Amino acid sequence: MDESRARALRNDLTTFASRWWAGEAEVTRTFFSQKRSKDEHLRWLRMQAFKELQPRPNGIIIRLISELRDDYNRLEHGVDRHDFLHKIQFLEEEFRHYQLFADVVDYLTGEKITPEELAQYEVPEEVRLRELRSSLMKEHGDLARFASSFCEGGGASLYYEGMQVGGDALHDMIATACRGVYEDEIEHAEQGASGLEQGHWTEEQWALA
């Protein structure tokens, strides 16, 4: 497949996904267009903090820490230093996202949120999404990994809309948190899109993506 065809298919995929990203943006705008109670904010903020930390045995933070520990013992002996650094940077990003939203939770409650408290905010839809991504990656490998990265964070719609709020201390903190995540998610999406565009995929694989 030539470069121009791959770029056209990437654009088609973006157009296809955009309808759902627009829907997420509309939901977020609607939420912030009305005055919300402390409990309403705490619910979504705790769910978001959970999503970033994933406080469970196979959660992304603890998994990356474990992988880095194992990889360090093989550094330059099967583990490339650039790949090792990339994993460190990814760990920093994910934990920083948690820190940003957890700080807003602490501001509202006046107490420190703990991983144990956050564990109760895992919703069934998140579990199903995680299981779906895992099964697709096992079946389709890099194709599913790039497609998942491309769509990561719902096109960053929530974070983009959240960046626009402000006017008081709470909403300023929310905007700061969303801005910090937005910039990273856009980069992840670009990496996924580039991986798809530069891969040697067939028309059928693009349709599957």
Regions found by a protein language model. Give the residues of each.
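Non-heme di-metal
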Residues: 1-209
